[in-house]
Regions:
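Short, small-residue-biased leader/transition segments that mark boundaries at the very start
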Residues: 2-9
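Short, functionally critical alpha-helical segments immediately adjacent to catalytic or ligand/cofactor-binding
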Residues: 13-28, 61-66, 118-119
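C-terminal functional modules
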Residues: 168-223
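Acidic, His- and aromatic-enriched active-site or binding-groove loops in soluble protein domains
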Residues: 37-65, 99-101
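Solvent-exposed loop/turn segments at secondary-structure junctions
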Residues: 24-28, 82, 128, 140, ...
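Flexible, glycine-rich surface segments
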Residues: 72-182
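Second-shell loop/turn segments in exported
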Residues: 8, 26, 43-51, 75-82, ...
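Secretory-pathway/luminal and periplasmic proteins that interact with or process carbohydrate-rich
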Residues: 25-35, 46-51, 67-73, 87, ...
């Protein structure tokens, strides 16, 4: 089921879905054993700073269980209340989850619905089909701020001493990504699709892990 459905998903390449589900749950092997009701109730009452957020998630979870005719006591996930293969929070379920297998239910613990829901999440966050994600840079730019929220013109990055290892297509701007590889830093041009991956988890290293894991799995399948 992991890849045969992707013909129906022209928006998002299979390797991104494989990367997301791989990083989140090791392809379904680690989806969490905490009762979601307990997790969200505990966080709602014991963490005042985020009580409003988790109370809203708890309400949405209970509405989800009712609409899907699930017993809320049976559903298990992460300590933070994230659910299923893609570790959706209840609010993400409400906004982005889809019934991809057409059985009349949205089930985030079903791999088919999970694949469709991850794809829809990316579609709604602006993924551009066929576009680049990131391009490695030659050179170092220690004087520039880095991170997926930065924005530089290609000429600014060139003036700082960076050169892309492949053409950037029509992109005239990029974020400057810096990865610690132990022996030093590796710089990358981050493009809009990379930023879209960070909408799933707001971390440069997370997004790079998702992308590179997906590519590695894709390449391994081709060998």
């Amino acid at each position: 089921y992991t890849l045969s459905l992707h013909d129906a998903l022209p928006i998002l390449p299979p390797e991104i879905i494989v990367g997301i589900i791989g990083v989140e749950t090791r392809w379904g092997r680690v989806m969490g054993k905490t009762r979601i009701l307990d997790a969200l109730a505990t966080l709602s009452f014991n963490y005042p700073r985020r009580a409003e957020y988790f109370s809203s998630e708890l309400e949405t979870f209970l509405l989800m269980a009712r609409s899907e005719q699930d017993d809320p006591l049976d559903l298990k996930g992460s300590f933070a209340g994230a659910m299923g293969y893609g570790q959706f929070m209840p609010s993400s379920y409400r906004q982005y989850a889809v019934d991809f297998n057409g059985d009349g239910h949205i089930n985030l613990w079903d791999p088919v619905d999970a694949i469709g829901s991850v794809a829809n999440y990316f579609k709604q966050h602006g993924w551009v089909s066929g576009d680049l994600v990131a391009v490695q840079a030659l050179g170092q730019a220690p004087g520039l701020n880095n991170g997926f929220k930065t924005k530089y013109s290609v000429s600014q990055l060139a003036a700082a001493g960076l050169t892309p290892t492949q053409p950037l297509g029509n992109h005239q701007q990029a974020s400057l990504l810096r990865l610690d590889i132990g022996t030093g830093y590796q710089y990358w041009y981050g493009l809009p699709n990379f930023y879209t991956i960070t909408r799933y988890n707001h971390s440069t290293h997370y997004a790079m892990a998702v992308w590179q894991l997906g590519l590695a799995v894709s390449q391994a399948r081709m060998q």
